[in-house]
Structure formats: C-alpha cells, structure tokens
Amino acid sequence: MKELLIRNERCLGCRSCELACAVEHSQSRNLLGAISESPRPRYRVHVTSRGGDCLPLQCRNCEEAACLDACLSGALQRDERGIVVCDTALCVGCFMCVMVCPFGIITVAEPERRIVKCDRCPERAEPACVSACPTGALIYQEIDTAARERRSAVLERLKGTM
C-alpha cells in the first residue's frame, strides 16, 4: 500500500502543497477559478513551522484511528485503499473527530459546518500536494520502497565516515 511520506529536511515552507490541495478540491479545479469561488476551497495539508523548521502535515490514516471510533453517525469510514474518508451526507456536525485527532489535522469548514481532511486525491495517481512540492519533501510510495531507500541513504552516509 502506498503512503504519503514526509522528508521534513526538504520542506522550505513554501506552501505550494496547500495551494495545490485547495485547487484540487475546488469546484473549478484551476487556480483562477478557485480564487473566485465562494466559499473558498479548503486545503487538507497544513504546513506548520516553528523556529525555522517547516513540516507539511496531513491525515496519517492511523491504524487505530480515534476519529473512526469517535464518529457518532458513521460518516467516517475506511475505504478500499485504507484511507479514512468522510461521507458528508452522513455527517451530523458533532465534530468529535476534530476533538480526538491526535495530530489536529481534521478541521471544520465554515459556513458549511463540515469536516475537512485529506482524502489522498482519489482521482489522481498521486496526491496534488506531492505533485506540487518543488523540493520532493512529500513523496507517495510503497512503505517497503521508502524503507529500502532510507537504508541505502544511511549506508552511503556511513561509507563517507569510514
């Protein structure tokens, strides 16, 4: 299964991922149209910065997702890809999922009073945020491939110290 992985050392805090996400989830699916939409489209990835370090955060689709357990109406479900998705027609706006998310990533869209969370852009081969990232801080790949690449990188660094 593919996961959205973060290489935080590469994030510049440019927020290209946020913009691409909002445009992808807009009605027009283009920047000019998205800017003029009302209400404005919401992004689902959040670039957080502190002390010069930046980190793009989005739903981690936790194995034991507290939001799924907290959802009173059954609006939150795990789809066939393993992604936690929201059926807005079932959502009653209790926002229990917002309160229990350990990452603070599920947010509320006003004035619709519905939740907004990353859905991994199901119509795309890779999420819009990944495609938009100019530094490769966000990658979408199989966990095994990512682990193998990290091990190779560690080996290369170790070779340089010997």
Regions found by a protein language model. Give the residues of each.
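Flanking helices and flexible, charged tails adjoining ferredoxin-like Fe-S electron-transfer domains
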Residues: M1, Q27-D69, A89-M162
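N-terminal beta-strand motif that seeds the catalytic metal site of vicinal oxygen chelate
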Residues: M1-E9
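Ordered, amphipathic secondary-structure segments that act as subunit-interaction surfaces
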Residues: N61-I83
